[in-house]
């Protein structure tokens, strides 16, 4: 494993700035269940690891009766199936989160990571597609929303 820098931005703007600066040489860390394996195997060559777990909006679950449920990209799966609003209104999301790896993996893995990794074995993706889940994607030019199905095909 080669030496890499580590950055832990505390705002979404800072995280986006790092990702823009380093491009393909940045590794995005939410839970790390896939990224760390790739780094150890030298299958992903990164100059910097951008750890997004300290970005508040990426690490929270929000529910509003009008706008629905928002789950940040770095929320660990175990927090999803322990949330009372998710249990009450979105049990299918719990099903999707609970099939990602075993108990230890679920303490770190996230739906965002499962989706962004784009692995054929991404356990939660079929359920998210069936439920019509959308991704809110942040970039240097603002936000956009994309259905999970389109995100997976991009």
Regions found by a protein language model. Name each.
Residues 1-154:
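C-terminal structural segment of proteins
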């Amino acid at each position: 494993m080669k030496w890499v820098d580590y950055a832990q931005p505390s705002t979404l703007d800072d995280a986006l700035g790092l990702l823009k600066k380093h491009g393909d040489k940045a590794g995005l860390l939410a839970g790390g269940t896939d990224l760390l394996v790739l780094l150890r195997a030298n299958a992903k060559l990164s100059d910097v690891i951008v750890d997004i777990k300290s970005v508040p909006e990426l690490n929270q679950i929000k529910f509003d009766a009008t706008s629905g449920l928002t789950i940040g990209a770095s929320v660990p799966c175990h927090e999803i199936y322990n949330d009372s609003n998710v249990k009450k209104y979105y049990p299918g999301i719990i099903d999707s989160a609970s099939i990602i790896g075993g108990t230890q993996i679920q303490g770190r893995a996230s739906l965002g990571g499962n989706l962004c990794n784009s692995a054929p074995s991404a356990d939660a993706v079929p359920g998210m597609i069936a439920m019509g889940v959308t991704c809110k994607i942040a970039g240097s030019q603002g936000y956009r929303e994309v259905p999970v199905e389109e995100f997976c095909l991009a």
